[in-house]
Amino acid sequence: RSSAASDVYKRQLVYIVPKAGYYYDYLNEPYLYKEWTPAHIGKAVFDEKHPSILGGMFAIWNDHVGNGISVKDIHHRIFSPLQTLSVKMWTGAQTGIPYETFNEKRALLSEAPGVNQLARIGKKPELVYERSTVAPGSTSDYPEIGYNYTVSFDITGAKESEGTELFRSPNAVFYLSDPIRGMMGFARDGYLNTFPYKVNPGEKATIQIEGDNCSTTLRVNGKVVDEMNTQKLYFNAGKDSMNYVRTLVFPLEKAGNFNSKVQNLKVYNYCVSKP
């Protein structure tokens, strides 16, 4: 430590505030891996073992209450830089292998033994799960699938009461008929988001939901019904605004008690509209 207690760290490059428009939404990992060490303080570069440098850290700060950011979204922003900055804080400037090699090899690692908060299924882009029929109350092989994904199924509609679920997991619910207006939609982290669409009794349709870390898109019979991307919300008589995020890690664990007929369920670990 310095005698003047002027221990320092630089946060701008390693500080996340999700969708705020200031600081980072996602860290610039290629730059951090190639150029950054805890010895970089603003434009100054200290000796790697300078006594005033106690170590390194990075942070995510959720400044905006009600912006729709989920626990899964926070984890999605943290896990990858946790790997990158762990290397940099351990090795400093001497990383040993190029970033491209590091980025490829780390994809083979799990988050931790028995941990899959990113809800990754499979190692390459492919169809990862399918069922010919989804029976009410049945369970699946996976609790959920994370970004990026496509879930599709055929449905023959029947009368459904409000609050009828298609699937649920410990983290989210996807509704055939949401509890408020009876529309298709989803709930997670205390937020309810609904599409301008409902399956009417007797209607036959092919439903497709695509999700990534920015949006959730509903297609019916191949046509986009709604792309729930980042939405601008205004408050304080329009003087202030905030970005609102409508993402979903799609629940698969248990089917709801629906009356409709659901067939040809297919789950892909990529967005099929963005090959």
Question: Model-flagged regions — what are they?
Answer:
Residues E126-F186, V262, V267-K274:
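Extracellular glycan-recognition modules
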Residues R1-Y9:
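Single conserved hydrophobic/aromatic residue that forms the stacking wall/gate
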Residues T37-E104:
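Substrate-binding cleft of secreted/luminal carbohydrate-active enzymes
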Residues R11-N28:
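Polar, glycine-rich mid-to-C-terminal structural blocks
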Residues G68, S80-Y147, G157-A158:
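Carbohydrate-binding surfaces of carbohydrate-active enzymes
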Residues V225-Q263:
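Flexible glycan-contacting loops in extracellular carbohydrate-active proteins
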Residues V151-F153, E203-V220:
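Short tryptophan-centered beta-strand motifs in secreted/extracellular beta-sheet-rich domains
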Residues G185-T206:
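Short, aromatic/His-centered strand-loop micro-motif at the edge of beta-sheets
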